[in-house]
UniProtKB/Swiss-Prot annotation:
Mitochondrial matrix side: 1-42
Family membership: Belongs to the TIM54 family.
Mitochondrial intermembrane domain ranges by topology: 60-572
Region of interest (Disordered), residue spans: 1-21, 185-221, 363-404
The encoding gene: TIM54
Stated name of the protein: Mitochondrial import inner membrane translocase subunit TIM54
Signal peptide limits: none
Biased composition annotated in UniProt, kind: Polar residues: 192-205, 212-221, 363-376
GO annotation, cellular component aspect: cytoplasm; intracellular membrane-bounded organelle; membrane; mitochondrial inner membrane
Membrane topology reported for the UniProt record: Single-pass membrane protein
Chief location: mitochondrion
The organism of origin for this protein: Yarrowia lipolytica (strain CLIB 122 / E 150) (Yeast)
Entry's Gene Ontology BP terms: protein transport
């Protein structure tokens, strides 16, 4: 009764909120599809971000393909032109260098994505010359020019010091010096530059064969000479009918490769044929800056402090041996203890130690191969090892890369150096061969000494070719993350810029090199280089951070590609 008489509350009870019905459709409901509702706020944010990023990447990739296809179609007519069986396509030499503080893979990816498709569509032959250490491009260009000068002087070529051992290089230099002395003495000797003759000559000079044709019987010598002359005439006839295209070209990808290429031109035409530094300076290790891992870590402040190595086992054994020699009474106790364990070899070793000092290093090295002994012992090459001696778990000996030779001439010495006498004649022969072949490609001279026939030699001599500079902008650093993200979503602009520059190198005109403006091509890329890397380069005298010094005499006949109908290059 008390409950019935209790006064009711005047406040109304809160009713439950009605459930959202969402989108209902009888047809969907008949198919068993649940009610469709809008996602929650958090899911809306998530899908918006994912959709925006995915859409941006897809749109940029789609536009990039369109731009690439546009430039491929612009040069496709060159690839569709019929090529004769004896016609050699035009060759382009591409120089690539890793970006500062990073690896070579980035610039190679840049080449394969934006440059290679256009060269392939134009059916051009191209050779990529890449460097892993600073200075290699400069040395390759300079050494190519020096070998050309040696060839014009009648001297043998010297192999690249990056590809041969120091002994082989010194041997080649000695042979060249001997040839110079022979020419000075006025003696004449028949030298055949034919590769086939040189190959057969190397076979005849093998161990067990006569060292020279003079030591052969007269019949064998006559047969050898007749066969050589016939092979030489055949090669000459085939070469005379080949349709070489002397209109080659050079592409420098990035500011660093361009600076090294210009330095190589000056070193080759103005520098001496041989390294002016003494031999002891050449044997010193050249600083591999900046594209070695240790230099990258140093430039980025990631170098770890060296940790002191623990005492080696040999030093421990030596200290024990000295202690036993100074306390003979301990040897007897140790011998008795070991004799109870049955180790007779250990007793003998201890007794020998008590008798006198033992060469612990040699004995330990023979049984345990300690680090101290293995460092002093030169490892035997795998080719000289027998199957029983070879240990597959043993570490291979470290292969040290040959150092990059330093420049033969410094930039401040350009003005005082004398230009090579073969500079003007080389460019004139190259231009004459190009004009003759372009005017009548089907008419080939029979005489290889004529200017047009000499164009065959200029296919490999890229340093006479016009230059095209293609940008490669690469930025690093955490503070540059917003700029890196913006560039990532705008790679279509890179494809447009690089594609236009590549098409200019394939189909564009040429103009003389401008010593006032052209040295600053792609100078804006230097602002993207890491500041720590640049500072270290300035301290170590890096070639990349030095200002570009050009000589009017060297760049007088050098050409630069430009778009057709334009007076100035836009690649700045």
């Amino acid at each position: 009764m008390a409950d019935e008489t209790a006064p009711k509350s005047s406040k109304p009870t809160a009713e439950a909120a009605p459930k959202k019905t969402g989108y209902t459709n009888p047809a969907l409901r008949a198919m068993g599809i649940r009610q469709l509702r809008l996602p929650s706020r958090n899911w809306m944010i998530f899908w918006t971000v994912v959709g925006t990023i995915s859409g941006g990447i897809y749109y940029d990739r789609h536009e990039r393909k369109k731009v690439r296809q546009q430039y491929k179609d612009a040069v496709a007519y060159l690839g569709e032109r019929p090529l004769g069986g004896l016609e050699i396509p035009r060759k382009i030499t591409v120089f690539v260098a890793p970006p500062p503080g990073d690896y070579l893979d980035h610039v190679l990816t840049h080449f394969r994505a934006y440059i290679k498709p256009i060269l392939t569509a134009a059916a051009l032959d191209f050779e990529v010359k890449q460097e892993s250490r600073q200075g290699e491009i400069r040395y390759v260009v300079a050494e190519g020019i020096r070998n050309y000068r040696r060839e014009q002087m009648g001297l043998p070529k010297v192999p690249s010091r990056l590809m041969v051992d120091e002994e082989e290089y010194n041997k080649a230099v000695a042979e060249q010096n001997a040839e110079v002395e022979r020419l000075k003495a006025g003696r004449e000797k028949h030298t055949n530059p034919n590769p086939t003759f040189q190959a057969f000559n190397s076979i005849n000079n093998r161990p067990g064969a006569p060292s020279s044709p003079d030591s052969q019987p007269e019949e064998q010598m006559s047969i050898s000479v007749a066969g050589t002359i016939a092979q030489e005439q055949l090669d000459k006839e085939i070469t005379s009918k080949l349709e070489f295209n002397p209109e080659s070209g050079v592409i420098c990808v990035g500011r660093g490769a361009y600076k090294e290429y210009l330095a190589g031109l000056h070193e080759g035409w103005l520098g001496p044929l041989e390294d002016p530094r003494p031999d002891e300076d050449n044997r010193k290790v050249y600083e591999e800056f900046p594209n070695r891992e240790k230099d990258d870590d140093d430039a980025l402040g990631l170098v770890k402090t060296p940790v002191e190595e623990p005492t080696t086992a040999v030093q421990n054994v030596q200290s024990v041996s000295e202690h036993l020699n100074s306390h003979p009474e301990m040897v007897k106790d140790v011998s008795e203890t070991i004799s109870h364990s049955g180790d007779v070899t250990a007793v003998t070793d201890v007794e020998q130690t008590a008798a006198g000092p033992v060469d612990v290093v040699s004995e330990t090295a023979s049984t345990h191969d300690t680090p101290a002994a293995s460092d002093n012992k030169t490892p035997k090459p795998l080719s000289e090892m027998s199957p029983s001696e070879w240990d597959p778990k043993a570490p291979l000996p470290e292969i040290k890369r040959k150092p990059v030779p330093k420049p033969y001439i410094r930039p401040e010495e350009y003005s005082e150096a004398e230009l090579s006498e073969f500079y003007a004649s080389g460019f004139e022969n190259a231009s004459t061969a190009h004009s003759t072949v372009s005017s009548n490609i089907n008419q080939q001279p029979n005489d290889l000494n004529s200017p047009a026939g000499s164009g065959t030699a200029f296919v490999e001599q890229f340093f006479f070719s016009p230059i095209a500079v293609i940008p490669h902008r690469h930025i690093m650093g955490f503070m540059n993350t917003p700029l890196r993200i913006a560039r990532y979503f705008n790679k279509r602009a890179v494809a447009d810029e690089v594609g236009a520059a590549t098409v200019v190198a394939v189909t564009g005109d040429t103009r003389p090199f401008d010593v006032k403006t052209d040295p600053d091509l792609l100078v804006s890329e230097e602002y993207d280089w890491p500041s720590k890397w640049v500072k270290k380069g300035q301290d170590n005298g890096s070639e990349w951070v030095q200002p570009v010094v050009v000589d009017q005499r060297v760049m007088e006949k050098v050409k630069v590609y430009q778009p057709k109908g334009e007076g100035e290059s836009e690649l700045k």
